Amino acid sequence: MSARSAALVFASVLSAALVLMSVPVAAQVRTAFPEKRGFKLTDFPRTVKLADNVYGYEDIRQPGFTTVSLFVVGNDGVLIADGQGSVEAMKKMLGEIAKVTSKPVKWYIVGSDHGDHTAGNSLLPPDVTYVVTPFSKGQLKLSAPAMAGDKQVINVGGIEVQALYLGRAHTGGDLVVYLPKQKILFMSEVFLNRVFPAMRSAYPTEWVGVIDKALKLDVDRFVPGHGFIEEPKASREELIEYQKALRAVIAEVNRLHQAGLSAEDAAKQADWGPYKEWFLVEQQGPIAVRKVYEEIEGKLK
């Protein structure tokens, strides 16, 4: 090939590359529906590396969205924050952790005490150290000691992990898990990414305030308890959107309550706006109405 021909080929390749660079990359679809996100069931479980020795874990649960766990690999052991919703699912998770490290599980943080995060905990080592709020200890009937305050620091073999109680939110005992050096906050069920606010055990208005506290922490990446793990910028945007969803649900239910509707009629007439497209809206919408009615009427304990 002559020098002139080579130059023409190079110019052609460079021009094509510049054209490709100018075409915007399709934005990641923001949804909790796996198929809309481009996933197949066979893509799960997924282990997502968040930082050196820090991993998110997503697996599909019924009725078809993800439950998310966190695990941290230290020099001498592993910390898990939230498990999965059955013995079978937890066995699968422990198997995936074993692909990353042969170190034993030494610590377990109860982010949520609900069964979809704890039903497989019988597979944890008998000498595992639990980190749990007094409320969740009571719910799970654990013999392990509860946290004495709102913060417990765990040294996971050289990695600082903080279990933080920011207040009542999805339950009365939610813990979030903060890694200050990595600027990661695993939020358990305080953050349900693109999943309609699930309020069976919730404190709706307090939940909004807990997210305010989370947003004030020095965090680059917020990791949800359900829905998909996002890249850092999108994770903050989605947490803010989730807080907007909570506020919208509370406002709409207050409107219906002021109109004199019963909770049953309010659930039928509620207009959830853009959040009607979110996962679980049919199941969780009526529950949210009842819970906000309890809050309005002073019946929330």
Name each model-derived stretch.
Residues 9-22:
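Bacterial N-terminal signal peptides
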Residues 25-27:
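Boundary at the C-terminal end of the N-terminal hydrophobic targeting segment
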Residues 31, 49, 133-167, 171-173, ...:
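Metallo-beta-lactamase
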Residues 47-96, 175-179, 184-187:
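Conserved beta-strand hairpin/beta-sheet module of binuclear metal-dependent hydrolase folds
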Residues 81-83, 106-114, 131-135, 185-188, ...:
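Active-site neighborhood of phospho(di)ester-bond hydrolases with catalytic His/Asp-centered motifs
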Residues 88, 95-156:
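Active-site HxH/HxHxD metal-binding segment of metal-dependent hydrolases
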Residues 208-261, 265:
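Divalent-metal (often Zn2+) His-rich catalytic cores of metallo-beta-lactamase-fold enzymes
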Residues 258-301:
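C-terminal regulatory/interaction regions
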